[in-house]
């Protein structure tokens, strides 16, 4: 308990130094500079971890740290902005950045794999056609040549003029196959298809190398832009109206002062007001916040469906090629029989018989697809888990953004409190008389109305406890 109290006191003292404007004294200046340097170091460190390409060297990181320190020491807006950036990483800006990163992982991973499987299928088909061209033409022609030579061997040489003329005859058979024509056609077709595939694969690889950097830069830009718009609306001419639905501790104190001065007060809120306005701190979302939570998760669900669609197309192509390859492996080969028939005196006899086997698909030409599920969906699972956590914490982070902004700009916070207080009073003045009487009757049923001594005793005990603590 003592460690928790000491840690809380240290944090509150550092927070007061960071939020308060710079004091003229040297000691206060050194404390202010130290806190700003610590925040700058944490900010640059997190940026280096999240986007190592953005600060690739120690010199760049050191220069960024020095610039951040100077900005934090000199500008209250910069100190508020950098804290709001961290909180915005858990809101819609951070959600959009994570969705962009997940979309890049899915598209670049699965599309590249689809192109790889298509290329493997094309290579397998051309390889098999080339192999079948040789395995069909040459065995047939070889057997045909053997048959011709066998017939030539059966021929009876001429015996006319043997004593005058000597016969020296030979049989020369030339082999010609149109396979080179098929080879040229295959090369032309393969070249045309592969040129398109290689171009698309090269484009995919370039996008894959640059995509992570561009998406990280786009996500960081979205966070910075969203934070800048929030500060602009909060500090703008109508800033007291922007997201002014939170009942803060300062609002409660203001309402208590109004009560002590016998002026109209708004606390406690009625049932309808509790549905619309949020009492800080609270972990139970209002109906409006639950609606915003649904809107927060809607883009996540839409992009998740798109990611699953890309993965399904990739997986179906993988299963198709894999099943076809498995069927090709299980197909039996063809046995080709060559028979030479001879006719003699009206009867046909088989005078030469030979056979050879031809496989339907060459084993070394079977395509081997791949489906790298872990390389894509492991980081996607981490991104989805972070998105779910951010969605559940979005209402709390929004409350923290309002509290941080109010700490840096107390004058704006006073205007917001006065506006919200007047708005509630104006709305209640338009309520029917019966509703006012019902609220009054509820107030009359409270015990401190009839026994104000109990309220005074409780207040005295709280004052004594606060005095002992101080």
From Swiss-Prot:
Tissue: Preferentially expressed by dendritic cells (DCs). Detected in both immature and mature DCs. Highly expressed in lymph nodes, lung, kidney and liver. Expressed at lower levels in pancreas, bone marrow, spleen, leukocytes, in freshly isolated peripheral blood mononuclear cells (PBMC) and B-cells. Not expressed in freshly isolated monocytes.
InterPro entries listed in its UniProt record: CSR-E3_Ligase_Protein, DC_STAMP-like
GO CC annotations on file: cell surface; endoplasmic reticulum membrane; endoplasmic reticulum-Golgi intermediate compartment membrane; endosome membrane; membrane; plasma membrane
Keyword Hydrolase: no
GO biological process, one term: cellular response to interleukin-4
Cytoplasmic compartment segments: 1-34, 79-97, 231-292, 398-470
Main location: membrane
Alphabetical keyword list: Cell membrane, Differentiation, Endoplasmic reticulum, Endosome, Immunity, Membrane, Transmembrane, Transmembrane helix
Origin: domain of life: Eukaryota
Post-translational modification: Glycosylated.
PANTHER family: DENDRITIC CELL-SPECIFIC TRANSMEMBRANE PROTEIN
Self-association state and partner proteins as the record states: Monomer. Homodimer. Isoform 1 interacts (via the C-terminus cytoplasmic tail) with OS9 isoform 1 (via the C-terminus tail); the interaction induces DCSTAMP redistribution to the endoplasmic reticulum-Golgi intermediate compartment. Isoform 1 interacts (via the C-terminus cytoplasmic tail) with OS9 isoform 2 (via the C-terminus tail). Interacts with CREB3.
Role according to the record: Probable cell surface receptor that plays several roles in cellular fusion, cell differentiation, bone and immune homeostasis. Plays a role in TNFSF11-mediated osteoclastogenesis. Cooperates with OCSTAMP in modulating cell-cell fusion in both osteoclasts and foreign body giant cells (FBGCs). Participates in osteoclast bone resorption. Involved in inducing the expression of tartrate-resistant acid phosphatase in osteoclast precursors. Plays a role in haematopoietic stem cell differentiation of bone marrow cells toward the myeloid lineage. Inhibits the development of neutrophilic granulocytes.
Record note on domains: Several domains are necessary for interacting with OS9. The region in the cytoplasmic tail that is necessary for interaction with OS9, is also required for its transport.
Name the UniProt record assigns to this protein: Dendritic cell-specific transmembrane protein
